[in-house]
């Protein structure tokens, strides 16, 4: 244990408080404080520690002269968190040297290190004349600069006047501190399945597996996404077993350009042109590298299920999401999209086989850029789609957006292919109190599969406005109008004008196109209006509205989607009223759903200091009505269990009836577990005619230089916790995440290019484990697997009473273990606390600079000491 870490534990403990690994030399701080107080009137003179304040015999006190210079620590190298002007900079080993009588010890920081933290070295006279590896005398060279080491927090606080700092944005973290992570392989798996027993329609089985694998080498990230699906039913002979490869790509960041290079399968940004999947190469700006103060969307999907239903989401022809949801309103906000744009097709398949299908627009908000900021993308490759009727057309695309003074932004782009050419130009304006508006036009020349040539234009308006005084947030109002000759690039990749086929005894024949086709180039898009608004009502209520209206050339049929909801709370009682409407151009009639949800936590009836497990439970009621006469009512209870609240449950029962379906009782029960090695869920639902069992497991596997670590599903950027010896330690602020039997864990997500705090809960450490530092800070790059290391000392906690020449060792003497690197300070009566000690060994003691001011003590402990919380021992130091 380093001296610095010992002082940390001294500051956070009381006397002989031994709850969780900390016995402190509390008397050191107490008596030293008294010494300071006694000398306060002599503030104009040098501080002096009179040993007689500590003991009558001056020989019973170690040499404390270093405290006279304000040194809580001797000179040396210590790992500290560096903060500059209250902003975190880095965690690193810093060498501290002896300063003058007022400074105590001072940090040794080089010119390059200070420059990386934002110091404008050219503005400091004489600094650029120093050698590259020289220690900069910061407090003397920079006027009004300070450097203070907070021993208890292991934190080096630097302050430098703004006049000497480079002009950097708030929240700026120097790229030198970005961590590309370790070399490692990863695998994400998500398996789900269900079995349905239908008294009328027979039995059916469905399974789905999503595998996301990857390899990190240096700054390069290799990723692959593959899915497998299986279904069988009594209605059809045999079963369908299908593997589908989604994409594979290699990428890395280009830090000087604040950009990202992608090779392989990727997607274009949907800010100017419609987003498309490609196979090729792309170099594009990555605004995540900018600080939050310089940064300007996957959509949240709302829906309502009549019963326990399977929700599938497609984007650009690929299945990107699959889940089973209970009856009533649901929200999906964790989509792993195959691209950053492209409308999402949501299918809700009920247990009786009926389906709802609607489209969620996926596009960006107005394209304003900060003054002087440029965002670009350059893409070359071939078009990719999950639709076999689309060809792999080669293309080139470039886009550029640039911020001008006075809130103006200009932008544009081009798409070029053999049968398609498009050019876009637009302008945006921040209109202050009136909101933000952008307008652009695209001119396109297209050749369709029938070799017909078309010229057309498409004009788009986007508007965004927040009315803070009224609580209204108009998140997006968009309108696009296209002439009859306008087609987008994807339209020209089809091999035929329409793709509707039916299977007959004579084989495949071409029939008259209908709107059951997913595409028909005879009916190209005309006008589209979309709106998203949220309104705050008072302090506890929110109203949201979202919808879209799409018209086509050549037909009066339209696509319509509308959703509305009211969320409110009365004390701790929450209720939600929601409505949805979906009408597809190819579908007769429309789907509508009205739902009400009420949730009352059991804590509403419990005392605030109740320890009952029911304080984590709630009662619920839900009602849904499809406005065609069918209604479902459910009541039940849901909540969490276990110490970490990582087992959630829900039990609902009720009645469904009316409309076209049968009437009778209905209900469901689910269990969801989030553990250190992955997640699992199981559920069961029933009605009079249908019974359904659904289940799933998901998790992540990380293969690294120190072995294989299992965890919860991994996001793009993750943290590997390395604390060998600290098994089963909980990671703070994470549900179900604990270190494994070796002391490793995976924090399944982290924010790239931002400071991430990783901490272990010391209350969950074993009794024979101590941590030098329970907190680590990391700044990962995108896609990185960064390591947060914690040094765990495993061994016996020992309260040793040391004597020398039949007298207690001097107060304040330094004690160091030769084998465990543990150290401590002698308190009263020769007592010292040491942790992580072996059964047998020796300790070295030093209490001055004289030749006879040191000794060595050997000790031997009985085996049962390994099971004791604290072992006490007396030894003679010779």
Swiss-Prot record:
The protein here is known as Outer membrane usher protein FimD
Q: Which UniProt keywords apply?
A: Cell outer membrane, Disulfide bond, Fimbrium biogenesis, Membrane, Signal, Transmembrane, Transmembrane beta strand, Transport
Q: Name one GO cellular component term.
A: cell outer membrane
Is Nucleotide-binding set as a keyword in this record?
no
SUPFAM superfamilies for this protein: FimD N-terminal domain-like (SSF141729)
> Which Gene Ontology molecular function entries are recorded, alphabetically?
fimbrial usher porin activity
Any one GO BP annotation for this protein: pilus assembly
The answer to whether UniProt assigns keyword Ligase to this entry is no
What the record says about family reads: Belongs to the fimbrial export usher family.
- Does the entry annotate any disulfide bonds, and if so which pairs? 855-877
- List, alphabetically, the InterPro entries matched: Fimb_usher, Fimbrial_membr_usher_CS, FimD_plug_dom, PapC-like_C, PapC-like_C_sf, PapC_N, PapC_N_sf
Q: Topology with regard to the membrane? A: Multi-pass membrane protein
- Leader sequence range is 1-45
Q: Which domain of life is it from?
A: Bacteria
Q: Which PROSITE patterns match?
A: FIMBRIAL_USHER (PS01151)
Q: Which locations, inside or outside the cell, does it occupy? A: Cell outer membrane
PANTHER family per record: FIMBRIAL USHER DOMAIN-CONTAINING PROTEIN YDET-RELATED (PTHR30451:SF21), OUTER MEMBRANE USHER PROTEIN (PTHR30451)
- Role noted for this protein: Involved in the export and assembly of FimA fimbrial subunits across the outer membrane.
